[in-house]
A protein has these predicted regions:
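Long, compositionally biased charged/polar stretches
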Residues: 1-670
Length: 670
């Protein structure tokens, strides 16, 4: 008779425990034990508990390959979902085997858990483990199905409601409570103040901050004070919530006929536009993706979107300022070039049109497409193509946490027919769909890989570009961590090429996320460890640091709505006639539209509840010494980066904190 010691750990959450009967079967190389009920005096599987049991077997089982957990009814108690952290089995010889679970087990069922050592397919030589891998993937592919939500855009999980989503995809109770509680409180406040019921123009600019009078931060106060200044307008291209559009301009586009005479007053007598172009201090923001995007009516009135071109100059002081703005892609008498020398409110209106275009391009292409829809593609493909024992599953699963759930919520409340886009945003859902399609058609692998993106846009030497500076450090830290993991499990290029699970994962991302577009440069297969390292770094960076950069500052930079209008109620000006403040207020969104958009952005701020910062791995998917050492080194490097950012920010009038590692969540979870 052999007796095995079994230790079962239940999750900490208040709802993690169960009264159901839990039994176990041990499966080893030399046989399997009888099914054995795990039962001791008292309550066995309570939140936070670690309980030990003895499991007898008529004979020694040899090395333990996997275990089966059987969840069955207990007496008259109703079924309750159980969160199992892990199970440890110690053999009579003293060898300990770990079986990570870290998921909810719902319903009466049997769950198989494989021993924790990470293995690529060629490493699992025992037929039972090979059978387990195939069975797990078959089950996962039935559980996680794809669907096409908007033709021509990335596919998504076939889930219609967050309430019906598989329990392991859903927000934790603390996160869900905080998320929905904040949303209800925000809408209630706006309703009580009456803003949601007022489809009227703002009477004064000073009334706008009253929507959220309780919220003040150094950034929001700075925006209110400086929103009209050219230097702050330019600053946001580098360190706002869409820092990926600006690019070096070495020759003016043919459709943007800016002349030396137009910009001489801005550049000064000591230089010229040609000299500044040659020097590399001229930059361009081109919103051509917005050309011909359809718009809708809001509050019974037609809305408008522009596709502007904005020329920018970095002064010797480091400030980036706008030189010229054209509000369409077609130059001509009806599309004048606006200049800082124009009348105050005309120039402010031109810049506000650009900021409104920034809203659409940022929210749809930079944020929704690149940070959310791609994160969901990575998440679904990981669940479908990589078994739990695969080292890449263990590496990636923390970076997919809640990504599917937040996107299901977005499809329910934000981008659905009749959702926020149809109620408060100029493009509505039809324009959103078209912009998503155009965004994906123009998205490249280069743009997704930060070092390549910086080089391609020619912005490596721009001063005061903190998104770039912090982002490159974080990219390098992730890359070093990933390279170490890849080096442990893939010693040769052949081991990468022959990993059919890895290749299926990459292939599915290519076909479902990028629709098989070879012009994107996104790989459909991977052939070397270096290629794999770069690809994995891109995935983790996108789901964590990139999402933080384009999400975290939305509310505080937009809380003063003229800095980020979701719609414009009059067409772009076709001449340089003087503009009054009243005309400006009659162009930007009404009170109820402003209130709804700000309420949504408030809810979508980074959620403190159950937030896991980048590099935090409370669940031990990896149990080997090598990966643990790499995790510790990764965390140490992130701590160094944090200290460097803290020191830098002390000298800045406006701190850049969106790429501060403690503020970056491991996954696209909000």
């Amino acid at each position: 008779m052999a007796v095995y010691k079994v230790q079962v750990s239940t999750g900490q959450g208040s709802l993690a425990g169960t009264f159901d009967t839990i039994s176990i079967t041990l499966v080893g190389i030399d046989g399997e034990s009888p099914k054995h009920v795990l039962d001791r005096y008292g309550l066995d599987f309570q939140p936070g508990s670690v309980r030990e049991y003895e499991v007898p077997s008529e004979r020694a089982l040899g090395p333990i390959l996997l275990i089966r957990l059987h969840k069955e009814p207990y007496s008259v108690f109703p079924e309750s979902t159980w969160y199992c952290n892990e199970v440890r089995v110690t053999s009579p010889e003293g060898d300990t085997y770990r079986f990570p679970c870290y998921r909810w087990i719902q319903g009466y069922c049997t769950v198989e858990l494989v021993e924790s050592t990470a293995q690529i397919p060629s490493g699992d030589s025992h037929y039972l483990l090979q059978k387990y891998r195939r069975a797990e993937l078959t089950l996962q592919q039935e559980r996680y199905r794809w669907k096409e939500y908007i033709p021509g855009t990335p596919w998504c999980a076939d889930i219609d409601s967050a309430m019906t989503a598989e329990v392991n995809l859903q927000y934790s109770f603390p996160k869900a409570s905080a998320f929905f509680g904040r949303g209800l409180a925000t809408l209630l406040e706006s309703k009580l103040k009456g803003f949601l019921d007022r489809p009227y123009s703002w009477e004064t600019l000073t009334d706008i901050p009253k929507i959220f009078w309780f919220y003040h931060s150094p950034v929001s106060e700075y925006v209110i004070e400086h929103w009209q200044e050219d230097a702050f307008f330019g600053y946001q291209y580098l360190n706002g919530f869409n820092p990926v559009l600006i690019r070096k301009c070495t020759a003016l586009p043919e459709n943007f006929p800016v002349t030396q005479e137009m910009v001489a007053g801005s550049l000064g007598e000591s230089t010229s536009l040609r000299e500044e172009l040659q020097r590399g201090s001229i930059y361009l923001a081109d919103y051509k993706l917005l050309e011909d995007i359809p718009t809708i009516e809001v509050n019974g009135h037609q809305q408008y979107v522009a596709a502007p071109l904005c020329l920018l100059h970095q002064k010797p002081s480091g400030e980036v300022v706008p030189l010229a703005i054209q509000l369409s892609q077609r130059p001509g008498p009806d599309s004048p070039i606006f200049l800082p020398s124009d009348s105050d409110w005309l120039w402010t209106l031109a810049k506000t049109w650009v900021r409104s275009s920034e809203f659409h391009l940022h929210e749809v292409s930079s944020h929704l497409l690149r940070a959310h829809l791609l994160a969901e593609v990575f998440s679904v493909a990981t669940q479908r193509q990589l078994p739990m024992c695969h080292p890449l599953y263990k590496l990636l699963i923390p970076h997919t946490r809640f990504s599917i759930h937040i996107n299901v919520l977005a499809r329910t409340f934000l981008i659905s027919s009749g959702g926020v886009f149809d109620r408060a945003i100029a493009t509505g859902r039809p324009g959103l769909a078209e912009l998503l399609r155009k965004g994906l058609e123009n998205l490249t692998y280069t743009a997704l890989c930060l070092p390549d993106d910086i080089q391609e846009r020619g912005v490596g030497s721009v001063q005061r570009y903190y998104y770039r500076d912090d982002g490159l450090k974080i990219w390098a830290a992730i890359e070093s961590f990933v390279s170490g993991i890849v080096g442990i499990y893939y010693q040769t290029s052949l081991s990468v090429q022959s990993d059919h699970e890895l290749q299926a994962w990459v292939g599915e991302i290519f076909t479902k996320g990028f629709l098989g577009r070879q012009a994107s440069g996104v790989p459909s297969t991977l052939g070397t460890a270096a290629e794999l390292t770069k690809y994995l770094t891109m995935v983790i960076f996108t789901c964590s640091a990139y999402h933080a950069a384009v999400n975290a500052g939305q509310f505080e930079l937009a809380v003063f709505m003229p800095n980020y209008p979701s719609s414009m109620r009059k067409p772009p000006p076709r001449n340089k006639a003087k503009v009054t403040l009243k005309e400006f207020l009659d162009t930007i969104p009404e009170m109820n539209t402003t209130s709804l958009i700000l309420s949504v952005l408030w809810v979508l701020r980074n959620e403190d509840q159950d937030m896991r910062p980048l590099g935090t791995y409370p669940e031990e998917h990896f149990t080997e010494h090598g990966p643990k050492q790499l995790m510790a080194a990764f965390q140490d490097r992130l701590a160094e980066i944090s200290r460097e950012i803290e020191e830098r920010n002390q000298s800045l009038a406006l701190s850049y904190k969106y790429m501060y590692p403690p503020n970056i969540e491991n996954s696209t979870a909000i």
